[in-house]
Amino acid sequence: MTYNILQGGRRGQPVLDVVRAAVPDVLLVNECPKTPLLWRRRSRRLAEGCGLRYVAGGRPAGSNLVAVAPGVGVVSVHAERLRQPFGAPRRGVVAAQLRVQGRLVGVVSCHLSLDADRRLVEVARVVELAARLRGPVVVAGDLNEGPDGPCWRLLERAGYVDHGSSQWRTFPAERPERRIDALLVRGDVEVLKHGDPGVDAALLAAASDHRPVLARIALV
């Protein structure tokens, strides 16, 4: 599941309630805690509050984070900031090589810029990092553009498939009009479900300005 939790999850308990209700094995977070000196402890607390284990990310990854359920193994991680113009928000990417049901699976979480030109530079780096991962790979996050945008097309050209539809728009959470949060998959998998995490709409609106995107994936 990918989820932009809004400014470090500042709305508190509703964020945790959304994730616990969705029961993801892997959670990819945008806008996780980033306060200097405190981000690591707060990121771990966030993951634990969701019933998960912090894996990687946080401030060094431009506020992107990976957390996993107890049964998911971690092989390796990589986090980096993406260069931005002076005064622009922090951006970054976090990648993790995981082991799920004895199989290698890669995940990459990103939150792309509001600037269209910057987004293309950033997503190219995302694709480069994702190519280093083995097994099926999930690339997910807030792309800040709709599915007809150039970043989605670049990901699709790199082999990532969008299984979503306009039936699950993600922003703004209270009355979603746009599908700007993506979860794309490459590799030998079957996507059983994509989009709606099955969480009450009022809780989603209380938790964040974005709705999460959940995929149920079978390894084949």
Predicted regions and their residues:
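N-terminal, active-site-proximal structural segment of metallo-dependent hydrolase catalytic domains
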Residues: 1-48, 64, 204, 219-220
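Active-site-proximal beta-strand elements of phosphoester/diester hydrolases
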Residues: 1-7, 76-78, 95, 104-113
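Active-site metal-binding loops of divalent metal-dependent hydrolases
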Residues: 5, 32, 110-112, 141-143, ...
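Active-site environment of divalent metal-dependent phosphoester hydrolases
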Residues: 8-10, 33-38, 115-117, 143-150, ...
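Active-site neighborhood of phospho(di)ester-bond hydrolases with catalytic His/Asp-centered motifs
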Residues: 27-30, 56-57, 138-142, 162-165
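Structured beta-strand-rich core segments of catalytic domains in phosphoester-bond hydrolases
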Residues: 31-104, 193-198
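Metal-dependent phosphoester-hydrolase catalytic domains
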Residues: 72-79, 85, 131-136, 145-220
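His/acidic metal-ligating clusters that form di-metal
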Residues: 95-100, 106, 120-143, 151-152
